[in-house]
Design a protein with these regions (language model features):
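N-terminal ligand-binding/catalytic initiation module
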Residues: 1-125, 131, 141
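Short helix-loop-beta connector
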Residues: 137-144, 166
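Active-site cradle of extracellular carbohydrate-active enzymes
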Residues: 147
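Glycine-rich Rossmann-fold phosphate-binding loop(s) that bind the pyrophosphate
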Residues: 150-151
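N-terminal Rossmann-fold NAD(P) dinucleotide-binding loop
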Residues: 154-155
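Aromatic pocket-lining residues of Rossmann-like dinucleotide-binding sites
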Residues: 161
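NAD(P)-binding Rossmann-fold cofactor-contacting core
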Residues: 164-188
Length: 188
């Protein structure tokens, strides 16, 4: 039976510790030739609005643990300026909405096991990757984090960093003062 798993359900069961451990295991499998992956590919097409492009993105991978997955994203991409700083923004349908979907299959019989909304999962995955980097590459006594941005990805990274290091000080670089200050309060 194919499962349909939404963001709320993922938030209820997936911890950052579990995500870091799963990704570490995946990287070990990849190094041992027991897993495969294709890096993300994004394809852009101009829309009727010259300031926006449609972007379709996919990435996929699997392992001898028995699973193969493909992640698909559908976005509208544009540039936005705030106080002289230009950033790339994206959304699906309207700002604030995102459309990412993972199809999980069995490598043993090809069965479709699950449709998974990737909104929360992708933040956890990217944050955990940062945490793994800090775990193995940062000085063992590092206590200060400098982070660019104050959005969802910054939150996921900080959650991962605090799982692998004792963080005493956070320096946030974000163009929007209100967002930067709120992020600092929430992370304290």
């Amino acid at each position: 039976m194919t499962l349909i798993i939404n963001n709320h359900e993922i938030q209820q069961v997936l911890t950052m510790e579990d995500t870091i451990a799963a990704l570490e295991q995946s990287y070990l499998q990849l190094a041992a030739g027991e897993a495969v992956c294709r890096p993300r590919i994004d394809i852009r097409i101009p829309t009727s609005d010259p300031a926006r492009n449609y972007q379709w993105g996919t990435m996929e991978g699997g392992s001898t643990a028995g699973y193969f997955a493909i992640r698909m994203k559908s976005d509208i991409v544009y540039e936005a300026a705030y106080q002289g700083v230009v950033t790339q923004e994206k959304y699906c349908m309207r700002p604030g909405l995102y459309c990412g979907l993972i199809l999980l299959t069995s490598i043993e019989n090809g069965e479709l096991l699950a449709f998974i909304n990737d909104g929360h999962l992708q933040h956890m995955r990217v944050g955990a990757d940062g945490g793994i980097g800090v775990k193995y590459l940062a000085d063992k006594d590092a206590e200060v984090v400098g982070i660019l941005g104050s959005g969802g990805m910054a939150r996921a990274h900080m959650e991962a960093f605090t799982r692998v290091r004792k963080i005493e000080k956070l320096q946030v670089f974000s163009p929007t003062r209100e967002n930067r200050e709120r992020f600092g309060r929430e992370m304290a």
